[in-house]
From Swiss-Prot:
Known EC number: 1.13.11.27
Protein name: 4-hydroxyphenylpyruvate dioxygenase
Binding partners and assembly: Homodimer.
GO molecular function: 4-hydroxyphenylpyruvate dioxygenase activity; lactoylglutathione lyase activity; metal ion binding; protein homodimerization activity
VOC domain ranges (all copies): 18-149, 181-339
Designated gene of the protein: hpd
Principal cellular location given in the protein's record: cytoplasm
Protein species of origin: Danio rerio
Length: 397
């Protein structure tokens, strides 16, 4: 495991401030929004569809504290772009949007450094105000939208969105999800694409390496991974980039690549200040999580006896809830992962609480992999790895 202190070149102008929202392309946006509201504790935020004058695409935006997810579906049978995307990838993340300052300059610089700009800056407005956007290509079919507010925006979400058509009376009766903001978003790559992708973020967006780990440190009996975390200059946006490493059997990273039809967003980590209450509530709402064996906690108790930090939370409760713990000399983190949130074994979510710890759970990767491998085996996908021809994503050639 390596942490980096060199932030690299400081952007002369413009800023990436934070994650603005995550856009999902799904088969049925209405039902997807209901699922995330029901299981994760989101609430309807805004709507765009036939009733608001959007004739091609319907959008349901949901929010929990500072987290905004947008679910989009095609309204018409002739939408080839969204139709082909659904056939190839299934439901999943299409776009990770960043709130920025000086969108024009950031796009100009990204373009000069080789980024594929899919849509040059444009402005939309309504009674709430003006917003500037631009779209750049990242790994696979995933994109980044830059969002810049041109003055205070007083609307519900973004121009064109209106009040949700319906608010489920059941939602206020359910326990809070206790989820606060997006901690990090992980992208899975085919073998040998991790470095080109992380280099792209450093070159085109002036991100820098924050953390990395290799397959000598992260492996099970069967499989392994490598990971590089890139972040913006202010370190408010963290994007781990994973790739599979050769092992005896197919890794869960390779399983994702196979079922997603290439690279894409593997998981979204949501930060909480009270993971115990969050997981008690989310389990009560019917959310499914990966499990950890009891011997994980037996080993953890032994390691904590000589640790320089003290975990404040009750270990018995953490064990009952199957929450994982990782720590160093300065602090610790608590984390747990959902099972895939669609039929394809692709996207899942993470709930994380940080206590003066800025890593990504390297000490838990082995336990996480073994838990996923158990489910992977049940799916018939923990198979002997065979060499495959894999092409580099267009954005990085």
């Amino acid at each position: 495991m390596t942490s980096y202190t060199d932030k690299g070149e400081k952007p002369e102008r413009g800023k990436f401030l934070n994650f603005h929202h995550i856009k999902f392309w799904v088969g049925n946006a209405k039902q997807a929004a209901v699922f995330y509201c029901d299981k994760f504790g989101f609430e309807p935020l805004a709507y765009k569809g036939l009733e608001t004058g959007s004739r091609e695409v319907v959008s349901h935006a949901v929010r929990q504290d500072k987290i905004i997810f947008v679910f989009e579906s095609a309204l018409n049978p002739g939408n080839e772009e969204m139709g082909e995307h659904m056939i190839k990838h299934g439901d999943g993340v299409k776009d990770v949007a960043f709130l920025v300052e000086d969108c024009d300059f950031l796009v100009k610089k990204a373009k000069e450094r080789g980024a594929a700009v899919l849509k040059e800056p444009w402005v939309e407005q309504d009674a709430g105000g003006k917003v500037k956007y631009a779209i750049v290509q990242t790994y696979g079919d995933t994109t980044h939208t830059f969002v810049e507010y041109l003055g205070p925006y007083k609307g519900l979400f973004l121009p064109g969105y209106k009040e949700p058509l319906f608010r489920d009376p059941l939602l206020p009766k359910l326990p809070s999800g206790h989820l606060s903001f997006i901690d990090h978003i992980v992208g899975n790559q085919p073998d040998d694409e991790m470095v080109p992708v992380s280099d792209w973020y450093q070159k085109c967006l002036l991100f820098h390496r924050f953390w990395s780990i290799d397959d000598k440190q992260i492996h099970t009996e069967y499989s392994a991974l490598r990971s590089i975390v890139v972040t913006n200059y202010e370190e408010t946006i963290k994007m781990p980039i994973n790739e599979p490493a050769m092992g005896k059997k197919k890794s869960q990273i390779q399983e994702y690549i196979d079922y997603n039809g290439g690279p894409g967003v593997q998981h979204i980590a949501l930060n909480t200040s009270n993971i115990i209450q969050a997981i008690v509530n989310l389990r009560a709402r019917g959310l499914e999580f990966l499990s950890a064996p009891d011997n994980y906690y037996e080993s953890l108790r032994e390691k904590l006896k000589t640790a320089k930090i003290k975990v404040k939370e009750d270990l018995k409760t953490l064990q009952e809830l199957k929450i994982l713990v990782d720590f160093d000399d300065k602090g610790y983190l608590l984390q747990i992962f959902t099972k895939p949130v669609q039929d394809r074994p692709t996207l899942f979510l993470e709930v994380i609480q940080r206590n003066n710890h800025f890593g990504f759970g390297a000490g838990n990767f082995k336990s996480l992999f073994e838990a996923i491998e158990k489910d992977q085996d049940a799916r018939g996908n923990l198979t002997v790895l065979t060499a495959q021809n894999q092409s580099v994503s267009k954005a990085f050639q």
